[in-house]
């Protein structure tokens, strides 16, 4: 039977986590490196992931793109401990290369806010149990200010726009200051201008906090704008692993970025042979 080196770590599916440098409730988690070797996933007779070999250095921002059904979200769920691989190995490593169990959080396309809780109380959910209530409230206030919702702490989720609700979901993920943050199509339901604003926010908090980030998206432009590296999946295999060498901040429409987008689209459509 194939060994699955995958220690269960603290990943709250509904709530991500982060907070400001001076927030008293938690300390910043060290980013973790991620290594996949021969990773497979099947549902019945359907092989969704086929021999995935991938190393993500600590602190890197990686985007995963591809056609619907290529295995993107399945890969992310396995990374976050929400699903088990059928075969292969998954390791998280600390700065010394030793196996680690990182503080990891995930943000979904649907914010999944609790309607009976205020914005601040929704964010506090991301801390889990055992945190002093005053410290938790202070941390929530700080992280909401960081995502530019400092004036919405006592608001109800139903009164927020779609973009504001997604900012709350991001704050909930960030309040625990994760070492790994997964983003599963987090901007897919937002309008174009709100998406750009959220991209800038995600880029900023990633640069400030230094966590390892894995983004799943259908948007090639979004992937190129945010990631250090873009992985194209095709029928469960890695078809292209493309570095994005451009300095940050990146301007939408930059000719060099447009060229990279073209290469990625060709790989998705299968018109470049994966090269």
Swiss-Prot record:
Q: How does it sit in the membrane?
A: Peripheral membrane protein
PANTHER family, per this entry? ALIPHATIC SULFONATES IMPORT ATP-BINDING PROTEIN SSUB, TAURINE IMPORT ATP-BINDING PROTEIN-RELATED
User: Which keywords has UniProt assigned to this entry?
Assistant: ATP-binding, Cell inner membrane, Cell membrane, Membrane, Nucleotide-binding, Translocase, Transport
Q: Does the keyword Membrane apply?
A: yes
What is the name of this protein?
Aliphatic sulfonates import ATP-binding protein SsuB 1
Instruction: Briefly state the protein's biological role.
Output: Part of the ABC transporter complex SsuABC involved in aliphatic sulfonates import. Responsible for energy coupling to the transport system.
Q: Give the multimer and partner information.
A: The complex is composed of two ATP-binding proteins (SsuB), two transmembrane proteins (SsuC) and a solute-binding protein (SsuA).
The cellular component terms of Gene Ontology attached to this UniProt record, alphabetical and capped at eight, are: plasma membrane
Query: Mainly resides where?
Result: membrane
What organism is recorded for this protein? Answer: Rhizobium johnstonii (strain DSM 114642 / LMG 32736 / 3841) (Rhizobium leguminosarum bv. viciae)
- Organism lineage: Bacteria, Pseudomonadati, Pseudomonadota, Alphaproteobacteria, Hyphomicrobiales
Q: Which PROSITE patterns match?
A: ABC_TRANSPORTER_1 (PS00211), ABC_TRANSPORTER_2 (PS50893), SSUB (PS51291)
Cell compartments where the protein resides: Cell inner membrane
Q: Where does the ABC transporter domain start and stop, copy by copy?
A: 34-260
Example GO molecular function: ATP hydrolysis activity
Tell me which domain of life the UniProt entry assigns to the organism this sequence originates from. Answer: Bacteria
Can you tell me which family this protein belongs to? Belongs to the ABC transporter superfamily. Aliphatic sulfonates importer (TC 3.A.1.17.2) family.
């Amino acid at each position: 039977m194939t060994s699955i080196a995958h220690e269960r770590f603290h990943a709250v599916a509904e709530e991500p986590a982060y907070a400001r440098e001076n927030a008293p409730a938690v300390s910043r988690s060290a980013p973790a490196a991620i290594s996949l070797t021969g990773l497979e996933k099947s549902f019945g007779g359907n092989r969704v992931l086929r021999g995935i070999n991938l190393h993500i250095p600590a602190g890197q921002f990686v985007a995963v793109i591809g056609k619907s059904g290529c295995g993107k979200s399945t890969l992310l769920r396995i990374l976050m401990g929400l699903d088990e691989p059928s075969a292969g190995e998954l390791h998280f490593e600390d700065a010394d290369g030793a196996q680690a169990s990182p503080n990891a959080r995930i943000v979904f396309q649907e914010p999944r806010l609790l309607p009976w809780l205020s914005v601040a109380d929704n964010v506090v959910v991301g801390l889990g149990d055992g945190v002093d209530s005053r410290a938790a409230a202070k941390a929530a206030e700080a992280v909401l200010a960081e995502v530019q919702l400092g004036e919405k702490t006592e608001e109800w989720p139903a009164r927020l726009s779609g973009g504001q609700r997604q900012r709350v979901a991001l704050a909930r993920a960030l309040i625990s200051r994760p070492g790994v943050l997964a983003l599963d199509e987090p901007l897919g339901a937002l309008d174009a201008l709100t998406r750009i604003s959220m991209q800038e926010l995600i880029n900023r908090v990633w640069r400030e906090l230094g966590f390892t980030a894995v983004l799943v998206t259908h948007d090639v432009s979004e992937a190129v704008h945010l990631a250090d590296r873009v992985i194209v999946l095709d029928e469960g295999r890695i078809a292209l692993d493309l570095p994005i060498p451009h300095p940050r901040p990146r301007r939408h429409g930059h000719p060099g970025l447009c060229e990279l987008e073209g290469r990625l689209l060709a790989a998705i459509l299968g018109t470049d042979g994966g090269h």
